[in-house]
UniProtKB/Swiss-Prot annotation:
Signal peptide: none annotated. The lineage of its organism: Eukaryota, Rhodophyta, Bangiophyceae, Cyanidiales, Cyanidiaceae. It is found in: Plastid, Chloroplast. Probably a ribosomal protein or a ribosome-associated protein. HAMAP family: Ribosomal_plastid_cS23. This is Small ribosomal subunit protein cS23. One of its GO terms (molecular function) is structural constituent of ribosome. Keywords: Chloroplast, Plastid, Ribonucleoprotein, Ribosomal protein. Part of the 30S ribosomal subunit. Belongs to the chloroplast-specific ribosomal protein cS23 family. Gene3D superfamilies: 3.30.390.140. PANTHER family: 30S RIBOSOMAL PROTEIN 3, CHLOROPLASTIC, OS04G0461100 PROTEIN. GO terms for cellular component: chloroplast; ribonucleoprotein complex; ribosome. InterPro entries: PSRP-3/Ycf65_sf (IPR038447), Ribosomal_PSRP3/Ycf65 (IPR006924).
Length: 101
């Protein structure tokens, strides 16, 4: 996952998830933000990742598995409007939390 970063926006009723590619020290967006459970963010990310040239199938599986774990964690902790960011970081070291609202 060192080549990819998952970004989340932690909201009270939704979680927004996007994937960026890390090239050197710069991040480049690979996907839009998709909202769970407002829409099926996992499926939308899968479709968008499927369309990415040069993305290996094993990397896609790792990314989507990580997204699944993040969604599960959000569902278990969504009552917490502001998550404990250090706890989030310990569960998901490659995660970038874009904000909490």
């Amino acid at each position: 996952m060192k080549q990819y970063k998952i970004k989340v926006l932690w909201l009270r009723n939704n979680i927004a998830i996007a994937v960026d590619r890390l090239i050197g020290d710069s991040l480049f967006p690979m996907t839009y933000y998709y909202f769970w459970p407002r829409t099926d963010a996992w499926e939308q990310l899968k479709i968008e990742l499927d369309s990415q040239p040069g993305l290996f199938a094993k990397d896609k599986v790792v990314i989507l598995n990580q997204v699944t774990r993040i969604i599960d964690y959000w569902q278990e902790n969504k009552k917490s409007v502001f998550p404990n960011l250090s706890e989030l970081q310990s569960h998901f070291p490659d995660l970038i939390c874009s904000g909490c609202y």
